[in-house]
């Protein structure tokens, strides 16, 4: 099994002028990728960093972050990927937790002679430490080797019928799991170009999709919804798309169908996490109801078992190595007999299709009744005025918790009242227990460094709003 650095070297030799990365400001060929990663690796070795030392990188989501990761691999170092939106508290925490000796925030001018080949990491070596998305509290550190991501890549190639003729675009931050395979691993494995944005902007994404004739898009649910809502969205601009991989958050069926109808691309997803890799996937061969209403069939190479109230545990080649030096967190992540838990509640039907009911921790307990935040979000998201929605628990003296929905409105809609939303849900025949009892209209939803909605901030906000 080749490593990323070996693949980059191969493409630089066979296709030196071929495009490896493009962003809104620059292009990088495979020869550039090889040369720049060689030079940075040489600089790090010359600075005295030894095999296994940890180097943190907090760089914009452009080509440089991939140069840094490959340079660390060539120098025999472990990269610590820190999201570009991480604040100083999170950066300090991750530096301390990993023992990283240096933080790279700009790699311009860091050049040296390429290190000897024998220093390079192998596919089974730890090459990356990244973090959980940190939607609540400080993030944990996840340990990765390349072998798991190449196994993931093979599944992605099969699911989306990917080839080296494709042009990829990843809108997901590279240090996180979704971004690792869509921007760092799969383009290198295919020898295909990848378009990345230093910071997500829907209009810029549309423009670059059209300019580079992107065929494979990777975006979390919120991002593809923002593409749909952007004034810059034009079906002809996205006509080159074949498939879009999404996930990381619940995928709203109605809006996913709208994306397919307006672009002609098939919406696909993997279900899993940074820690587990993937448990299930949809493919181009699945029919539309299964693609958009489920998280796909359980992956054959993964052993999946449901515990208790439907929480899946898994074993198999896609797993990470768990959390770094964190026995307490690993005790929660793994069962005593070695099953890695996802923290979700799911159902698996007789044909092997998996449906996510919600996070085990993402339920609102109203008067002793568990209400799935994901179900609330799905139903609220069907209102024609709603672009984005997040449901959280609001504290309540009588019931303990009540359902609170934060919504971002679609262009052309100036307001939405709780009464109007309730009328809509009543017309749909939605069970009253899932109706929001608090509604907050906001301009945007807060994001954790990994791009997911920071529900901890929303819970704190509604507590402040309701405080006497």
What positions do the PLM features span?
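Conserved AMP-binding A3 loop
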Residues: 29-31, 127-151, 277
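Conserved AMP-binding/adenylate-forming core of the ANL superfamily
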Residues: 9, 17-62, 66, 70, ...
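Gly/Ser/Thr-rich phosphate-binding loop
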Residues: 189, 214-219, 228-289, 303
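Conserved pre-ATP/AMP-binding loop-to-beta segment of ANL
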Residues: 16-17, 114-131, 138, 161-167
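Short beta-strand->loop structural element characteristic of the AMP-binding/adenylate-forming
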Residues: 56-58, 65-69, 73-102, 140-143, ...
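AMP-binding/adenylate-forming catalytic core of the ANL superfamily
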Residues: 217, 308-310, 316, 321-322, ...
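Conserved AMP-binding/adenylation subdomain of ANL enzymes
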Residues: 150-167, 175-216, 230
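Conserved ANL (AMP-binding/adenylate-forming) active-site segment centered on the GW(Y/F)…HTG consensus within
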Residues: 264, 288, 292, 319-343, ...
């Amino acid at each position: 099994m080749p490593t990323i650095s070996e693949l980059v070297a191969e493409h630089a030799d066979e296709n030196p002028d071929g495009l490896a990365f493009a962003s809104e400001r620059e292009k990088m060929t495979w020869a550039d990728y090889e040369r720049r990663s060689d030079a940075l690796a040489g600089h790090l070795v010359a600075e005295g960093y030894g095999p296994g030392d940890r180097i943190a990188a907090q760089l914009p989501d452009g080509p440089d972050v991939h140069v840094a990761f490959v340079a660390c691999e060539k120098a025999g170092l472990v990269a610590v990927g820190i999201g570009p939106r991480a604040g100083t508290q999170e950066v300090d925490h991750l530096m301390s937790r990993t023992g990283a000796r240096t933080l790279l925030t700009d790699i311009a001018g860091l050049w040296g002679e390429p290190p000897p080949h024998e220093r390079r990491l192998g596919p089974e070596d730890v090459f990356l430490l990244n973090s959980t998305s940190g939607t609540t509290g400080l993030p944990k550190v996840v340990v990765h080797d390349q072998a798991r991501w190449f196994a993931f890549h093979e599944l992605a190639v099969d699911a989306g019928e990917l080839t080296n003729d494709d042009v990829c675009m990843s809108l997901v931050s590279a240090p996180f799991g979704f971004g690792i395979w869509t921007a760092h691993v799969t383009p290198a494995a295919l020898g295909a170009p990848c378009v990345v944005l230093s910071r997500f902007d829907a209009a810029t994404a549309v423009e670059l999709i059209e300019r580079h004739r992107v065929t494979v898009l990777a975006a979390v649910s919120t991002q593809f919804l923002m593409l749909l809502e952007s004034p810059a969205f034009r079906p002809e601009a996205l006509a080159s798309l074949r498939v879009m991989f999404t996930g990381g958050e619940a995928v709203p069926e109605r809006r996913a169908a709208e994306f397919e109808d307006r672009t002609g691309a098939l919406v696909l997803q993997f279900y899993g996490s940074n820690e587990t890799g993937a448990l299930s996937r949809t493919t181009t061969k699945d029919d539309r109801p299964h693609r958009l209403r489920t998280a796909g069939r359980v992956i054959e190479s993964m052993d999946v078992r449901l515990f208790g109230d439907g929480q899946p545990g898994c074993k198999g080649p896609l797993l990470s190595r768990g959390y770094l030096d964190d026995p307490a967190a690993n005790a929660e992540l793994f069962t005593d007999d070695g099953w890695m838990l996802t923290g979700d509640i799911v159902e698996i039907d007789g044909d092997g299709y998996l449906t996510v009911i919600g996070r085990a921790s993402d339920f609102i307990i109203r008067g002793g009744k568990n209400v799935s935040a994901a179900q609330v979000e799905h139903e609220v998201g069907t209102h024609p005025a709603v672009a984005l929605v997040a449901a959280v628990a609001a504290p309540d003296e009588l019931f303990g918790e009540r359902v609170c929905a934060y919504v971002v409105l679609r262009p052309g809609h100036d307001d939405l009242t709780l009464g109007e939303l309730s009328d809509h849900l009543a017309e749909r025949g939605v069970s009253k227990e899932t109706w929001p009892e608090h509604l907050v209209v906001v301009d945007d939803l807060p994001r954790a460094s990994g791009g997911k909605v920071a529900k901890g901030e929303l819970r704190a906000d509604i507590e402040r709003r309701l405080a006497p």
